């Protein structure tokens, strides 16, 4: 017994110096990193708070515990330190509208790469949007561009009109009942159905037909957005989640099954497209011209290299398009519709413009996109809605791997991530009078060129949003469906601007997290 006690004591005693040594090594290493970041790092000369330069934990704390609040801390940094700040150990933020086009440049100007952590955190590295390398990104994006061009979207206009008509029919189900419905859920369902019709030839899976407008679909994306700060800073977590069997994940979070079902459907469609190509059934692709019926048919018949034709990579492409196309478009629609309904003068003028068009057309149906493009007040409303919903509020870091950038006499070393937020561009008081106010009239008549310069809801450059044409068409058609003489008479119910104003600046922005959403009732037109 005494020997056992002595042995245990010896082991415990001998282990203490080792533990202390490991702690000392860890502290020394950590202090060395902090010293390097503060005094020897290539960005040490740039202004900003020391704590942000020393550790990434400062940013993580704001985004995780502050619900995406780091953007507003960066705004405070700019107010204190000036138009360029070091926002974390390796990255710079610039707040200067004139410099935007020097960060977000076209592909023929110079190589531009993305920040790897953006793709790592979402596990979609193989999609074109998350591809880091400049040349590989261009190679993967190029075949997609004609599909989402103005002409490409026009090919799908009848599909879009059909989905929007389904939305109108669903709203009429609530007409005169006094029942409250979630319009933000309906918009997410609509956007999801539109992407589905473009990717998949025929499907029985529709979100709008669900009695609650596929509430779980909306809530799934909402949860993922809130989780992004964790995934982006600790990307191994999302990889672990991917390993969880579907049967277990379905029990833990039944909503996730909807995305799995959509992903499985995409994979099946990709395999069909590859089979059609192999048998010669689909050989209609010409460079820059859309003839294939679905996105996948188009891609498998494009000039993508074989290495980029795998089912896994094409499925990743579809998943990113579905996520981005659902969330950002639906939120922009919600923001726009609420702001119109809150302003009787705006709603009246918009309805009058639609009434004139409908009288000219002589029928109670959705106008063509080309007709909606000619309505100045509608387009002013759409533009103002996109400005205030921002698209992405989060900075979008870009890396110039070969060329140093110069800003206000400071040389930004090659390889430095530099980001600029659309929020800063859109809220610039020197460019927009009362920038937080919804004022469509600001886009009518002679528009200050600086307003167009600062208008970046889809970003710019070689990595700009792929589908602004689709977004404009969708939103314009929805507005026509809701504010024409024959439209369902929707009215807000216990909903105000705070239910749509983006105040949580995650990678994709959200309104206040305690919001009960965009609630409306549908009155009878004579009420």
From Swiss-Prot:
Specify the domain of life of the species encoding this protein: Eukaryota
InterPro entries linked to this entry: Cyt_P450, Cyt_P450_CS, Cyt_P450_E_grp-I, Cyt_P450_sf, Cytochrome_P450_monoxygenase
Q: Membrane spanning segments where?
A: 15-35
CDD domains from the xrefs? CYP58-like
Keywords, ordered alphabetically: Glycoprotein, Heme, Iron, Membrane, Metal-binding, Monooxygenase, Oxidoreductase, Transmembrane, Transmembrane helix
Query: What is the membrane topology here?
Result: Single-pass membrane protein
Q: What is an example of a Pfam family matching this protein?
A: p450
Gene (name only): bsc1
Family to which the UniProt record says this protein belongs: Belongs to the cytochrome P450 family.
Positions binding heme in this chain are 465
This chain is glycosylated at: 125, 496
Q: Which cofactor does it need?
A: heme
Q: Which GO terms describe its cellular component?
A: membrane
| Name of the protein in question | Fusicoccadiene C-8 hydroxylase
Main location, first listed in the record: membrane
Known EC number(s)?
1.-.-.-
* Function in brief: Cytochrome P450 monooxygenase; part of the gene cluster that mediates the biosynthesis of the diterpene glucoside brassicicene C. In the first step of the brassicicene C biosynthesis, the bifunctional diterpene synthase bsc8 that possesses both prenyl transferase and terpene cyclase activity, converts isopentenyl diphosphate and dimethylallyl diphosphate into geranylgeranyl diphosphate (GGDP) that is further converted into fusicocca-2,10(14)-diene, the first precursor for brassicicene C.
Q: Which organism is it from?
A: Alternaria brassicicola
């Amino acid at each position: 017994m005494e020997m056992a006690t002595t042995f245990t004591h010896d082991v415990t005693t001998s282990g203490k110096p080792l533990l202390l040594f490991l702690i000392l090594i860890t502290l020394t290493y950590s202090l060395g990193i902090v010293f390097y970041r503060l005094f020897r790092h290539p960005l040490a000369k740039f202004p900003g708070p020391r704590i942000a330069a020393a550790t990434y934990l400062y940013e993580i704390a704001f985004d995780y515990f502050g619900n995406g609040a780091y953007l507003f801390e960066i705004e405070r940094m700019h107010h204190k330190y000036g138009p360029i700040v070091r926002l974390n150990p390796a990255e710079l933020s610039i707040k200067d509208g004139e410099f935007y086009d020097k960060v977000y440049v076209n592909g023929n100007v110079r190589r531009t790469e993305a920040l790897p952590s953006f793709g790592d955190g979402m596990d979609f590295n193989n999609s074109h949007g998350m591809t880091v390398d400049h040349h590989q990104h261009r190679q993967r994006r190029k075949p997609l561009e004609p599909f989402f061009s103005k002409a490409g979207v026009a090919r799908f206009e009848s599909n879009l009109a059909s989905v929007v008509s389904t939305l109108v029919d669903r709203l009429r189900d609530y007409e005169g009942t006094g029942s409250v419905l979630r319009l933000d859920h309906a918009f997410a369902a609509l956007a999801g159905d539109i992407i589905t019709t473009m990717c998949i030839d025929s499907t029985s899976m529709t979100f709008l037909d669900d009695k609650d407008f596929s509430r779980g679909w909306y809530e799934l994306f909402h949860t993922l957005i809130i989780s992004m700060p964790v995934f982006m800073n600790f990307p191994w977590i999302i990889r672990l989640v991917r390993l969880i069997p579907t049967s277990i994940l379905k029990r833990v979070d039944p909503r996730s099954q909807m995305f799995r079902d959509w992903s499985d459907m995409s994979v099946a469609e990709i395999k069909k497209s590859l089979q059609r190509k192999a048998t010669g059934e689909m050989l209609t692709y010409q460079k820059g011209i859309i003839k294939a019926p679905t996105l996948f048919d188009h891609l498998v018949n494009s000039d993508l290299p074989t290495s980029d034709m795998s089912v896994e990579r094409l499925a990743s492409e579809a998943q990113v398009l579905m996520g981005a196309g659902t969330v950002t478009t639906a939120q922009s629609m919600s923001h726009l519709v609420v702001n119109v309904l809150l302003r009787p003068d705006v709603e009246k003028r918009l309805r009058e413009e639609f009434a004139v068009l409908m009288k000219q057309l002589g029928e109670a149906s959705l106008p063509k996109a080309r007709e909606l493009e000619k309505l100045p007040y509608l387009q002013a409303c759409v533009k103002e809605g996109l400005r205030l919903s921002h698209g992405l509020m989060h900075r979008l870091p870009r890396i110039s791997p070969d060329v140093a950038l110069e800003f206000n006499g400071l040389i930004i070393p090659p390889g430095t991530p530099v980001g600029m937020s659309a929020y800063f561009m859109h809220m610039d008081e020197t460019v927009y009078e009362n920038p937080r106010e919804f004022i469509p009239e600001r886009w009518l008549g002679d528009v200050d060129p600086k307003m167009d310069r600062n208008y970046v809801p889809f970003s710019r450059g070689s990595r700009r949003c792929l589908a602004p044409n689709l977004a404009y068409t969708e939103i314009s058609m929805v507005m026509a469906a809701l504010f024409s003489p024959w439209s369902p008479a929707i009215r807000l119910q216990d909903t105000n601007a705070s239910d749509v104003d983006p105040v949580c600046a995650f990678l994709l922005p959200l309104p206040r997290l305690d919001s009960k959403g965009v609630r409306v009732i549908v009155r009878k037109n004579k009420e």
